[in-house]
Amino acid sequence: KWGKKAAEVMPELVSFSDIAIGNEEDAEKVFGIKAPDVNVTAGKVEADAYRYVAGELSARFSSLRSISFTLRGSVSASHNTWSGVLWDQGAFYTAPQFDITHIVDRVGGGDAFSAGLIYGLLTYPEKQKALNFAVAASCLKHTISGDFNMVTVGEVEQLMAGDGSGRVSR
């Protein structure tokens, strides 16, 4: 209710950006670019379909060097699958999918992904590791009440390494 719709203001903002981050529905709702063979409502979200979306966005916005999407599959309100993709100057990366069976709070999950991706891109030379960090960080956020991701880098890296035990070492 701010006077304009996202589709009216986002194209200009994205034209000045070198990275765009969204969820599985944003490109369609804001830019009219639909991932082929995807049904978000039915929980059918295929990572490779977003290669097409990233290609279309990069063709439309030459400033973009990186484009990333979170991919949520809804099994129920408290059980989701969670992954993400990253297109980086033509290369395409897919993160492992997490099965989050006891969601505490979804609020802040996208912010945690964005923060994790920015941290990952600045910290790790490998783009795959940067994406994996973002997905793991946001996965952990789903287990925390409130919109702040109160986890450490070590805890995120532990989950990235395959430790899904839920143990927190402090």
What are these regions (language model features)?
Residues R65, V168-S169:
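Secondary-structure boundary/capping motif
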Residues Y93-D163, R170:
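Conserved post-catalytic alpha-helical subdomain immediately downstream of the catalytic base
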